[in-house]
From Swiss-Prot:
Function: May function as a system-specific chaperone protein essential for the assembly of an active chlorate reductase ClrABC.
Lineage of source species: Bacteria, Pseudomonadati, Pseudomonadota, Betaproteobacteria, Burkholderiales
Keywords, ordered alphabetically: Chaperone, Cytoplasm
One Pfam family recorded for the sequence: Nitrate_red_del
Name this polypeptide is given: Chlorate reductase assembly chaperone protein
Family the entry assigns: Belongs to the type II DMSO reductase enzyme chaperone family.
Single GO cellular component term: cytoplasm
Cell compartments where the protein resides: Cytoplasm
Top-level taxon in the UniProt lineage: Bacteria
Annotated organism of origin: Ideonella dechloratans
Applied biotechnology: Has potential use in bioremediation of waste sites contaminated with chlorate, such as pulp and paper industry wastewater.
Length: 193
């Protein structure tokens, strides 16, 4: 287990960093990525933007790689996934930013929600409150959502010849470390799917 991310606050930072990496690299995002050391400035924003568009957005709904859980898990049906995700978010009174037209099943939205759960867990532990509801929610969310579609997504991502290919192992390690920290057995949850 990676001891650098073996606490909820560090986990939240890891999820937020991953969310930045998989966000559209506009000028503001590029600034944050380079300032935080997440991307080598020598790569160039235009190069990263072209890779992002070519990998995730070209061809509309038939892009090479989809950042949407519902499109990565067609056997579950996107409508059902969206409804379940919205219930998750609503249970914790988390609202999507309507101005940015966020989708509940977008990878960045799921990463940001996991970061939020980790921060709530951290605050509960810091304040001497019960953190178990947030730990249980994170475990359940990982099993039902992100960890259910990440392995296939990651395999396809790592097969690309893009900058984004290098993010797959980091994201996979973060999720597996979090699951291990929560006491979830990765193989067991895969068998439940």
């Amino acid at each position: 287990m990676n001891t650098l991310i073996d606490n909820p606050k560090a986990m939240a930072s890891g999820y937020l960093a991953m969310a930045q990496m998989f966000s559209y690299p506009d000028a503001d995002a590029w600034r944050r990525l380079t300032e935080n050391g997440l991307v080598d400035p020598a790569l160039g924003r235009e190069t990263l933007e072209a890779e992002y568009l070519g990998l995730f957005e070209m061809g509309g709904g038939t892009s090479t790689m989809s950042l949407y859980e519902g499109q990565n898990r067609p056997e579950r049906g996107r409508d059902g996934i969206l409804q379940e995700l919205l219930r998750f978010y609503e249970f914790f009174d988390v609202h999507l930013n309507q101005d940015e037209r966020e989708y509940p099943d977008h990878l960045v939205t799921e990463l940001e929600f996991l970061a939020w759960l980790c921060l709530q867990e951290h605050a509960a532990l810091r304040d001497g409150r019960d953190a178990e509801p947030f730990q249980n929610a994170a475990r359940d969310f990982l099993v039902r959502h992100l960890a259910a579609w990440l392995p296939d997504f990651r395999q396809r991502l790592e097969a690309t010849e893009t900058t984004y290919a290098q993010y797959g192992p980091t994201l996979g390690e973060l999720v597996e470390t979090h699951r291990s920290r929560l006491g979830d057995q990765p193989q067991k949850s895969r068998e439940m799917q």
